[in-house]
């Protein structure tokens, strides 16, 4: 009798998917290989907003566990919590954070509110109302970010604005580009950038993996030191080649 297959759950890629979306296929292949080496056969389960179809397939497969790789559903990052919610409804075990945690942290605004409530410093910010002029209520420089989307989608050097006029221009450039393009303005703070990864350890305590620092090599004066879309995904761009990670730093 063959062992049941662990399910690799991820969002079905749309036609002409960007580099950021295609990355999930690399993740799925890497996870699948690791699980097979540990003796767990796998099956890929791409999902769409037709959650009933996904539920029927998962029910037929009856996987011993699900590796949740869903970061977006049909291009809507704000719906990412639907994946663990579906798995909860089916009573399936899965990797990663639970539904409530993903729901509360997929919105950067909700995350910042919870950080502030917990006494953790976070830069000043202002939400934006459709059709109203931006009035952050704090001095520049500013950085314009997506409320819901991750992976630096839409983020370029022009996201950093040093006055009200450039802020308004950046908002005009990015407003209305897709279903999840809600934006907010945050105080831009120049400084070093680190990547910190956490795993759940024994007794549900967080285990912090070794930190990595992003270097900004040969950035000309005035160029914002941010990890924008090009730095993350466009491997032939100067931003990509000039932002290596290092693990040995003072």
Annotate each language-model stretch with its function.
Residues 95-97, 151-154, 240-242:
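Short small-residue beta-strand/loop micro-motif enriched in glycine and branched aliphatics
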Residues 2-11, 29, 58-62, 102-193, ...:
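Active-site nucleotide/adenylate-binding loops and adjacent lid/helix of ATP-dependent enzymes
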Residues 164-250:
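Phosphate-binding site of ATP-dependent enzymes
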Residues 45, 128, 161, 211, ...:
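Hydrophobic residues at beta-strand termini and immediately following loops
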Residues 1-93, 99-100, 104-106, 110, ...:
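ATP-binding N-terminal substructure of ATP-dependent carboxylate-amine bond-forming enzymes
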Residues 41-43, 93, 121-124, 207:
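Conserved beta-strand segments of alpha/beta enzyme cores
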Residues 70, 127, 146, 212-213:
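Short secondary-structure boundary segments
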């Amino acid at each position: 009798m063959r062992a049941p297959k662990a399910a690799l759950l991820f969002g079905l890629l749309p036609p002409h998917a960007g580099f950021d979306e295609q990355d999930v296929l690399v993740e799925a292949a890497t996870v699948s290989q690791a699980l097979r080496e540990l003796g767990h056969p796998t099956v890929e389960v791409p999902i769409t907003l037709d959650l009933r179809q996904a539920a029927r397939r998962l029910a037929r497969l009856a996987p011993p566990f699900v590796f949740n790789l869903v970061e977006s559903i049909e291009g809507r990052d704000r719906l990412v919590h639907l994946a663990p919610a579906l798995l909860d409804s089916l009573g399936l075990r899965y990797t990663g954070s639970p539904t409530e945690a993903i729901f509360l942290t997929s919105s950067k605004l909700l995350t910042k509110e919870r950080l502030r409530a917990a006494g953790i410093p976070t830069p000043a910010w202002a939400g934006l109302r459709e059709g109203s002029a931006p009035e952050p209520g704090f001095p520049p420089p500013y950085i314009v970010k997506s409320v819901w989307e991750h992976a630096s989608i839409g983020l370029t050097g022009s996201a950093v604005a040093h006055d009200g006029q450039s802020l308004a221009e950046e908002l005009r450039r990015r407003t209305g580009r897709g279903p999840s393009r809600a934006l907010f303005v945050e105080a831009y703070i120049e400084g070093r950038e680190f990547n910190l990864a956490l795993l759940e350890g024994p007794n549900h305590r967080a285990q912090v993996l070794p930190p990595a620092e992003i270097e900004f090599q040969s950035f000309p004066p005035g160029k914002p030191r941010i990890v924008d879309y090009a730095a993350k995904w466009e491997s032939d761009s100067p931003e990509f080649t000039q932002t290596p990670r290092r693990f040995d730093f003072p």
